[in-house]
């Protein structure tokens, strides 16, 4: 192999190692996963959740430059892999909507019902309190996680999938 080709191959390999492992982040990929799971998902509700989240996040982009909606889709895909229900998948698609857009929990409740609204609200509340003291923050995070689990463990599962996806993009 000529020296120039070796250098190019080495540069490409080094660049590839710096890139995060891509996850399928299209809604079509999520729908494929939903269908392939063989579970009885409420596609109408999940489609409506995607449409609301996609419209709400339409002008937002991640640091990578990809549309923001790719993150909620990836979180929803993780939940499908775990065998979670339609309400959890819909809530995952909208988990940042109330926090980062003008859409309110009341609007989500009107369009999707109390169960989905409670899940979205629970995930939102897990991230809202800010602390300057690390020990206080850790204690409060533990308290919030325990409270969320006592109300509906799905809130914690959605939040953990959210954190997992955020950590995967930095690998």
Positions of predicted regions on the chain:
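Active-site helical microenvironments for divalent-metal-assisted chemistry
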Residues: 1-169
């Amino acid at each position: 192999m000529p020296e120039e080709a070796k250098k190019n191959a080495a540069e490409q390999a080094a660049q590839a190692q710096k890139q995060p492992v891509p996850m399928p982040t299209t809604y079509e990929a999520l729908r494929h996963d939903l269908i392939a799971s063989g579970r009885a998902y409420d596609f109408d509700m999940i489609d409506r959740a995607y449409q609301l989240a996609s419209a709400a996040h339409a002008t937002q982009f991640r640091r990578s430059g990809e549309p923001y909606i790719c993150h909620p889709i990836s979180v929803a895909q993780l939940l499908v892999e775990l065998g979670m229900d339609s309400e959890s998948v819909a809530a995952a698609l909208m988990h940042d909507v109330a926090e980062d857009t003008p859409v309110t929990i009341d609007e989500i409740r009107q369009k999707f019902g109390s169960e989905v609204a409670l899940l979205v609200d629970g995930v939102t509340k897990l991230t809202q309190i800010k602390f300057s003291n690390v020990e206080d923050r850790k204690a409060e995070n533990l308290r919030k996680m325990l409270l969320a689990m006592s109300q509906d463990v799905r809130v914690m599962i959605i939040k953990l999938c959210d954190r997992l996806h955020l950590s995967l993009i930095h690998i």
